[in-house]
Amino acid sequence: MSQTILEIKDLYASVGETTILKGVNLSIRAGEIHAIMGPNGSGKSTLSKVIAGHPAYSLISGDILFFGQSILEIEPDERAKAGIFLAFQYPVEIPGVSNSDFLRIALNARRKFQGLSEFSPLEFFQLITEKIDLVGMQESFLTRNVNEGFSGGEKKRNEILQMALLDSKISILDETDSGLDIDALRVVAKGINTLAKSTNSIILITHYQRLLDYIIPDFVHIMSNGQIVKTGSVTLAQDLEKHGYDWITQT
């Protein structure tokens, strides 16, 4: 049986005085792809940010285990270095910082954490030129400032490039399909499928079943009112497409 990478135990979390997560339980093993679906306000994005350690959210109770160790007291940057990757729904722009510099710094921070030697600029360039084909981008993309002036599709492909480069143990993709046309969606999905391996795991957070036409998850979880209320296969997402989220509360 494959190793458990992430385990969430009876997790409660809040923003200010508002409790958002109300007893979330989830276990993810190496090699698995999990899709989390649900209506607006159900807690999907909150869950992703709490796993990553976003400071805006307060933990009330419960635990998050990464390879069997609690990460509640670990800072967000240390979680990232350890192998937890979060692709945001709305990637931020970083004026004045080139993609190449940003990616090399991020990669070397992770390598240093792992006790590995840092890549020189030349070594990094050789690696990144291999990875960039994965997301269908030109080399000129590397000299542009991070996400500055990028289209929605370019921003999402940039995050998949980061995911490919960092080789994280668990990647959480928050509404990666949001705002993508069908061609961009196919490119992004191809990259994600290529990166799915027996040694890592992926969480896809999405509103819509269309992403799951291109990336077939092992499990689909439905969130409602801060809890996972139903789990099934990809056919669960297809049922949602037909009947809507109200169907879940009625079954």
Curated annotation (Swiss-Prot):
InterPro entries reported for this sequence: AAA+_ATPase (IPR003593), ABC_transporter-like_ATP-bd (IPR003439), ABC_transporter-like_CS (IPR017871), FeS-cluster_ATPase_SufC (IPR010230), P-loop_NTPase (IPR027417)
Gene name in the database record: ycf16
ABC transporter domain segment(s): 6-250
Matches recorded under Pfam families: ABC_tran (PF00005)
Record localization: Plastid, Chloroplast
Cellular component aspect of the GO annotation: chloroplast
Family: Belongs to the ABC transporter superfamily. Ycf16 family.
NCBIfam families for the chain: sufC
UniProt KW keywords: ATP-binding, Chloroplast, Nucleotide-binding, Plastid, Transport
Keyword Repeat in record: no
GO molecular function: ATP binding; ATP hydrolysis activity
Organism of provenance: Pyropia yezoensis
UniProt binding sites for ATP: G38, P39, N40, G41, S42, G43, K44, S45
Name of this chain's protein: Probable ATP-dependent transporter ycf16
